[in-house]
């Protein structure tokens, strides 16, 4: 299961969702503004303060750059 903590104004969030969409990987998006999650709560949930924060099978991998690196090295599929 993939979960993305995102915000509507966040460009890297859009890039992350596009990458997952292009690879036909299902994910659950949690908009931190709509869910009323502040940065401290986000850090407790994910370990990170910024969006996106991406969780794959209960492991937080970080943001878009980390997701892209995992994809480019072929390790993304291993985590799924």
Question: What are the residue ranges of the model-derived segments?
Answer:
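Local sequence-structure signature of Cys/Sec-based thiol-disulfide redox active-site neighborhoods
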Residues: 1-26
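Short amphipathic alpha-helix with an adjacent loop that forms part of the alpha/beta core around
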Residues: 39-45, 76
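A short, glycine- and basic residue-enriched loop/turn
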Residues: 7, 13, 48-51, 64
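Thiol-based oxidoreductase modules, predominantly thioredoxin-like and allied folds used
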Residues: 26-39
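Short alpha-helical
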Residues: 11, 36-37, 62
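Thiol/disulfide oxidoreductase modules built on the thioredoxin-like
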Residues: 43-50, 68
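Non-catalytic, surface beta->alpha helical segment in thiol-disulfide oxidoreductase systems
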Residues: 56-80
């Amino acid at each position: 299961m993939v979960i993305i903590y995102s915000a509507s104004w966040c460009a890297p969030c859009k890039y992350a969702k596009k990458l997952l969409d292009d690879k036909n990987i299902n994910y659950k998006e949690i908009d931190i503004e709509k869910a009323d999650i502040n940065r401290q709560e986000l850090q407790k949930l994910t370990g990170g303060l910024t969006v996106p924060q991406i969780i794959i099978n209960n492991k937080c991998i970080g943001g878009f750059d980390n997701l892209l690196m995992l994809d480019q090295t072929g390790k993304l599929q291993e985590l799924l």
